[in-house]
């Protein structure tokens, strides 16, 4: 840990030097980014204003297809979704890289935090935190919105694999073509999502799905009657 701490201190000192006296354009960009990030007074003054465009997109969601498009648009800003995606070597064919699809969408560390009694205090603190964030974002009745969002997230967690299952190299290796992926979540149009995210079709032409049953469970939650909860969750 000493090496990690020392390395982070060195990186910080380099960044601070860039902020104080940048010698070239790239160093100035680094310094400006750091200075902007550390300007807490300006951040507090701005409030939720920088999020206004994204919040408007979420407010406008009126159907599952609309939510799919919005999730794709937000993906370009690295906004987390209920599906995780990354590119990595193919365990079955290390000579190539392939897209991996994984379960996602939880604010707490893993699914056990939503069901085990030992985490009740953490769940209550999490609910209070979500309420505070929604209030700061100007959401009407943030307590009710937080309840809906966390109730939905708890349902999402019920379909997550536990940590032991996620470490199983064989169970989490499920190569699929795009058509097979689509069959797991018929309500989630991957083509609509990829177009909005500006992801090339080839990226999802063939994938490895880590937790297939999670996607089939997710499908049961992609319903019109849960749209209000999805909007609250996305905020």
Regions found by a protein language model. Give the residues of each.
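N-terminal mature-domain "stem" immediately C-terminal to a signal peptide or N-terminal signal-anchor/transmembrane
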Residues: 1-15, 167
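Noncatalytic, helix-rich "gating/capping" subdomain that lines the substrate-entry/channel surface
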Residues: 15-235
